[in-house]
Amino acid sequence: MNFFEGELHRMFGGNDIIHDPKIVGRTLLGKLDDDLRVKLQFVSTEVHKHYDAIQISILNRTDGVVDKETMLFGDIIGVKNTNISGRVNPYMWEEGVGKAYWYTPVTASDKALIADTVLDYVGMYQSEGMAMSL
């Protein structure tokens, strides 16, 4: 399991909204109901290999993209202080082959807030039958 897979697993593993999740690299794909799937992916919005956001795609398995949203980590958990660069928006830095880490200090509660924000958004697409059965 690489760094990104570990972060996705820690943030979204064991939730009650995304069923049968599959994690590969910077991407998680799972089921919301019989027809809808969700794809979560760490993305760079400004600088190559500075993953500062999570992109959420809601997909209908036969008709394609239903919705797509990109949430910046800085919008969710705020700007962070670093010893080197001062105040920066949080991001994961892929420095080389197999070497990635949070460039800014991100706590377990920050990660939980990111996960809760994403899952609140994704949960809006869950069918009422699936939500009621949980």
What is each stretch, according to the model?
Residues 1-7, 23-134:
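Intrinsically disordered, low-complexity regulatory regions enriched in serine/threonine/proline
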Residues 12-21:
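N-terminal segment of the mature soluble domain
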